[in-house]
């Protein structure tokens, strides 16, 4: 099972047809933004201060694991500032001209959102530096000895960059962000509120215990919680009367092979491989990727963060180690 096929993968191309539903249930204002209290409180102050001064919000870097709401937060910032937002991603901006076209079309105080900003090419980054710092665009015209540089003034704007790999950003780029926000995995109670709100937006009949059951198995990630909710809805409509209680949610999630800890087939495969094939570790990333037939980037960016955060896996200089908690979860003698 490749990562893209996992129901609980934070990003899943197989579910693009439900993007419309995702947009419908996303919060539009900070008041509706559940969890991440420290981020919400800080951004409320920064936004109000910028509005009082009639200035563009300072450039904002948002980082954290996939599915925690970086894009949602960027759109909320634009809504709160009452400005337009233009969205792109690092891999799309292949040439300096691609970025220049976006920047020159911005209006005063607008937001430019660049997802996966760590994947910007060095050439594009060089164009971004003066734009962020001085609101100026340096463009080379002509070639060879006849080449010359011209400066184009830009209106004040806010760059919002999102990344799952803040450490991969170059220091010059990272230092130009005046505001940095890290999104953490969500608490179960916050996820329960998110699931209940999504159910209300979709017009579903859902008990709080049903929302709790979905939240408990969502790996601390709103995107996964909403995806599981939609599958539980399908189960409730086909196998029941459409009403979602704790028992219905439990049966639906068990059918989806998502266990009580939110682990799916790939999570269990990874942990069991370490315990059964490598004696609990340490095991290197290359060997682990070969053992479970998965890409190294997927293991590092998607599988491992939650397992490490929950105490089932450890990264050491010698490799990955399955913890005592992992052995206890599977009932395996160490």
UniProtKB/Swiss-Prot annotation:
UniProt: Mg(2+) binding residues = 71
Q: Can you tell me which family this protein belongs to? A: Belongs to the RuvB family.
Organism lineage reads as: Bacteria, Pseudomonadati, Pseudomonadota, Gammaproteobacteria, Vibrionales
Annotated spans, Large ATPase domain (RuvB-L)? 4-186
EC number(s) from the headed UniProt entry = 3.6.4.-
Q: What is this protein called?
A: Holliday junction branch migration complex subunit RuvB
Q: Which GO terms describe its molecular function?
A: ATP binding; ATP hydrolysis activity; four-way junction DNA binding; four-way junction helicase activity
| Region (Head domain (RuvB-H)) residue spans | 260-334
Q: Which Pfam families match?
A: AAA_lid_4, RuvB_C, RuvB_N
The reaction(s) annotated as catalysed by this protein in its Swiss-Prot or TrEMBL entry are: ATP + H2O = ADP + phosphate + H(+)
- Please give the InterPro entries that the UniProt record associates with this protein: AAA+_ATPase, AAA_lid_4, DNA_helicase_Holl-junc_RuvB, P-loop_NTPase, RuvB-like_N, RuvB_C, WH-like_DNA-bd_sf, WH_DNA-bd_sf
Residues annotated as binding DNA: 315, 320
Keywords, A to Z, come to: ATP-binding, Cytoplasm, DNA damage, DNA recombination, DNA repair, DNA-binding, Hydrolase, Nucleotide-binding
């Amino acid at each position: 099972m490749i990562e893209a096929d996992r129901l609980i993968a934070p990003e899943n191309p197989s579910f693009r047809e439900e993007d419309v539903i995702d947009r419908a249930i996303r919060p539009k204002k900070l008041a509706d933004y559940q969890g991440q209290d420290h981020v919400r409180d800080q951004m409320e102050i920064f936004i109000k201060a910028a509005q009082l001064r009639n200035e563009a919000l300072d450039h904002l870097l948002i980082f954290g694991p996939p599915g925690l709401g970086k894009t949602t937060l960027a759109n909320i910032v634009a809504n709160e500032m009452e400005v337009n937002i233009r969205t792109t991603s690092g891999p799309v901006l292949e040439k300096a001209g691609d970025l220049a076209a976006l920047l020159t079309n911005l209006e005063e105080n607008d937001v430019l959102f660049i997802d996966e900003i760590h994947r910007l090419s060095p050439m594009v980054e060089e164009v971004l530096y003066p734009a962020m710092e001085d609101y100026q665009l340096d463009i080379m015209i002509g070639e060879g000895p006849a080449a010359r540089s011209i400066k184009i003034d830009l209106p004040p704007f806010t760059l919002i960059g999102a990344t799952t790999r803040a450490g991969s950003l170059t220091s010059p780029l990272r230092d130009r962000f005046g505001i940095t926000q890290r999104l953490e995995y969500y608490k179960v109670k916050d996820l329960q509120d998110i699931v209940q709100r999504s159910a209300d937006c979709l017009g579903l009949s859902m008990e709080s215990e049903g929302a709790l059951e979905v939240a408990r198995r969502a790996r601390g990630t709103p995107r996964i919680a909403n995806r599981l909710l939609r599958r539980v809805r399908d189960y409730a409509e086909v196998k029941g009367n459409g009403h979602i209680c704790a028992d219905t949610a439990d049966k639906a999630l068990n059918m989806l092979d998502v266990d009580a800890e939110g682990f799916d087939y790939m999570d269990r495969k990874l942990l069991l491989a370490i315990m059964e094939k490598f004696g609990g570790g340490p095991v290197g990333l290359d060997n682990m990727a070969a053992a479970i037939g998965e890409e190294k980037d997927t293991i590092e960016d998607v599988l491992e963060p939650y397992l490490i955060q929950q105490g089932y896996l450890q990264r050491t200089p010698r490799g990955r180690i399955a913890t005592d908690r992992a052995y206890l979860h599977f009932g395996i003698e160490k």
